[in-house]
């Protein structure tokens, strides 16, 4: 550690730390525009100038100078830096004056107003009048896609957006052209950005040059109520903030969570907001003479009860989709047990994961944060760029830092980092496990190898054998103590919670494929599973939020609450227990799903043993205690991996294909979003990758 004095406060800090970071550690506030902790240093805004005692007789850019670059005093005193001296104040005022020379007076009509770094710093270092008498420069706005609006006259050329697309997103969508006062930020030939993370440039932009196009002129930040929650558009559980005004969700922003999403979110997470308002189910419906007709809750429950009374438990099934919370799964499981039904399943894509194999058999055991320590990665049957863009960015970060070798088994993909393509399917994985492929030596030499196993490898008929083979490979590697190489990447937010709860078929029970076959069951309770096709014959009760495929097939519709309208527990792909918080209320007569199931159970004559969400959770925590530990990970046992590897089975030569065909349209909320539909239309174009 090195000693340094900041404004008279002596601190110990790593020698590689910048003066800006040292100042923050000492409690000093240093303004900046171009510097960002997760991007490379550019040093081009000069707003972070400080005075260095004994250094050059001019202010220094604190973001670009490290503590180790400073000389100690003549008697060995620690180097001294001043952040509030007259020299510093005058220098920053000069920089601010130059920045404002060409900046338009757009604050009253700028969407960044109230959240603008330039506004805040102009208050501290700006002047009330300008000495500049020449004409201001104007820059033509650029089209860069349906998500990001540009008003480039406001741009101060901090290059945060350029560095983000090149370094984090890995697409190199944006760049800087021309020189001097003619410099401009643009995309190549003014085409739409291709990254699934492009919305993050809006958060990074310190001025109003890049703003959210769908949110344009919608609200001011001081009008909004802010609720901390999590995202359920994929299985990562990114930390988000939901901003509402009245009953309406207006925008979703990221929250910092170093262990999960750092401070990035995907474009689907951010811009699915309009889907929360469109095509909503706001009242119960009952199918009469082949047509769905609006009904009261009593009429809907009566129709269900009448049908259930004509059959028995073994002819009733329960299916839960990817947006179902743990509380709802628990209520569904209790209702199924009370009716005598063994037919329950939450694995709507047909994955062969099962809780009987132990928790380690279906978790991302190394954890998301553990990717930062991985020294060899093989991706099997997954396209992380489509399935979990934020996790993909983390893999890229690790690859950029250490050039960690990455290999892929499955479909050929356009990822954002260099990788070796080993083959298409299970036979390639088998050859890798036998050591017949050169990359096997790379895995053996690694101390923290990572085998990312996607659902594309597990949904086939040989899915169980593929899982066993991957576990056998993971167990054969010599790894650092405490490291588990097997990492299951899920695509649904409710999948791990369902497996933890044992929401899988009981003895003699049917899985999703079996339940949906014609004539298999008389009644199916479908909770938000809109990606399945239920064949004719069964009476379908759909509990969900949108008029999607599930509602179209239903005989009775019971409207529920979306993830922004209820408090619910979810478990992400690494096994971290998380919770959504209510930011708004369901529309019309829609109700929270647990309350719907509780009321329905009364009418069916099988009252569920809870009368409130708190009571439901008490029973849930008794059944599965680790659900009570919010933001904690209950890890799996390494011995489970060894046992799983011994199961074996025949692996076919079928190719692994990612279950996500269209990143933007994976669930009913996204499919109801016009913004996501626009993005989906553009996504058919080839993806771009940064040139390294």
Task: Label each residue range with its predicted role.
Residues 348-635, 687-692:
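Non-catalytic alpha/beta scaffold blocks inside enzyme catalytic domains
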Residues 67-82, 476-483:
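Intrinsically disordered, low-complexity coil segments
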Residues 617-692:
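Long, low-complexity segments enriched in small/aliphatic residues
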Residues 35-44, 66, 179:
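Short, glycine-/polar-rich solvent-exposed loops and beta-turns at beta-strand/coil boundaries
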Residues 41-46, 236-238:
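Short, basic and Ser/Thr-rich N-terminal targeting/leader segments
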Residues 1-16, 24, 32, 36, ...:
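N-terminal export/assembly segments and adjacent metallocofactor-ligating motifs
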Residues 45-67:
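N-terminal single-stranded DNA-binding subdomain of primase/primase-helicase replication proteins
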């Amino acid at each position: 550690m090195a000693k340094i004095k900041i404004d008279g406060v002596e601190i110990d800090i790593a020698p590689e730390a910048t003066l800006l970071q040292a100042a923050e550690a000492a409690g000093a506030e240093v303004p900046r525009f171009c510097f960002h902790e997760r991007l490379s240093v550019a040093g081009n805004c000069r707003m972070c100038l400080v005075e260095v005692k004994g250094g050059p007789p001019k202010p220094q850019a604190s973001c670009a100078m490290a503590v180790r670059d400073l000389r100690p005093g003549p008697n060995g005193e620690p180097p001294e830096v001043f952040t509030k001296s007259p020299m510093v104040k005058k220098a920053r005022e000069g920089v601010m004056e130059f920045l404002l020379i060409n900046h338009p007076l757009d604050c009253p009509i700028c969407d960044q107003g109230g959240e603008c770094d330039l506004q805040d710093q102009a208050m501290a270092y700006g002047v009330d009048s300008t000495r500049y008498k020449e004409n201001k420069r104007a820059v033509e706005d650029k089209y860069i896609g349906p998500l990001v609006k540009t008003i480039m006259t406001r741009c101060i050329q901090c290059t945060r957006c350029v560095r983000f697309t090149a370094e984090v997103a890995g697409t190199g969508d944006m760049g800087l052209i021309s020189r001097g006062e003619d410099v401009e930020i643009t995309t190549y030939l003014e085409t739409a950005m291709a990254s699934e993370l492009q919305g993050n440039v809006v958060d990074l932009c310190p001025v109003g040059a890049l703003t959210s196009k769908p949110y344009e002129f919608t609200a001011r930040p001081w009008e909004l109520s802010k609720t901390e929650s999590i995202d359920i558009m994929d299985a990562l559980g990114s930390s988000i903030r939901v901003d509402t005004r009245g009953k309406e969700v207006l925008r979703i922003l990221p929250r910092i969570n170093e262990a999960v999403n750092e401070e990035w979110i995907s474009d689907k997470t951010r811009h699915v907001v309009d889907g929360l308002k469109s095509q909503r189910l706001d009242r119960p419906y009952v199918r009469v003479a082949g047509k769905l007709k609006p009904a009261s809750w009593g009429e809907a429950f009566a129709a269900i009860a009448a049908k259930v009374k004509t059959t028995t438990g073994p002819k009733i099934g329960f299916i839960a989709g990817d947006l179902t919370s743990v509380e709802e799964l628990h209520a569904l499981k209790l209702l199924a047990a009370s009716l005598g039904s063994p037919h329950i399943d939450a694995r709507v894509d047909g994955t062969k994961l099962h809780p009987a194999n132990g928790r380690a058999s279906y978790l991302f055991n190394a954890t998301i944060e553990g990717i930062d320590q991985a020294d060899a990665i093989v991706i099997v049957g997954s396209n992380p760029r489509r399935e979990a863009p934020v996790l993909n960015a983390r893999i890229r970060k690790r690859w950029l830092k250490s050039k960690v070798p990455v290999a892929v088994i499955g479909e050929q993909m356009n990822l954002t980092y260099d990788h070796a393509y080993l083959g298409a399917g299970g036979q390639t994985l088998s050859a890798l496990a036998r050591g017949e492929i050169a990359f096997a030596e790379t895995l053996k030499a690694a101390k923290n190898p990572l085998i990312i196993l996607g659902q594309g490898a597990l949904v086939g008929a040989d899915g169980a054998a593929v899982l066993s083979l991957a576990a056998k490979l993971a167990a054969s590697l010599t790894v650092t103590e405490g490291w588990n190489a097997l990492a299951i990447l899920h695509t649904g937010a409710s999948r791990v919670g369902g497996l933890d709860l044992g929401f899988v078929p009981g003895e003699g029970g049917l899985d999703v494929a079996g339940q949906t076959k014609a004539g298999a069951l008389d009644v199916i309770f479908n909770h938000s599973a809109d990606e399945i096709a239920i064949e004719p014959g069964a009476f379908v009760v759909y509990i969900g939020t949108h008029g999607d495929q599930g509602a179209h097939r239903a005989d009775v519709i019971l409207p529920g609450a979306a993830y922004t309208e209820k408090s619910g527990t979810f478990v992400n792909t690494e096994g971290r227990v998380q919770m959504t918080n209510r930011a708004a209320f369901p529309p019309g007569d829609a109700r929270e799903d647990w309350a719907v199931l509780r009321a329905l159970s009364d009418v069916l004559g099988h009252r569920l043993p809870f009368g409130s969400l708190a009571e439901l959770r008490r029973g849930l925590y008794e059944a599965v205690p680790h659900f009570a530990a919010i933001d904690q990970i209950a890890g799996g046992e390494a011995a489970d991996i060894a046992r799983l590897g011994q199961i074996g089975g025949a692996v076919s030569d079928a190719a692994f294909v990612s279950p996500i065909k269209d990143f933007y349209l994976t669930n009913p909320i996204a499919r109801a979003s016009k913004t996501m539909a626009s993005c989906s239309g553009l996504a058919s174009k080839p993806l771009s990758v940064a040139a390294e």
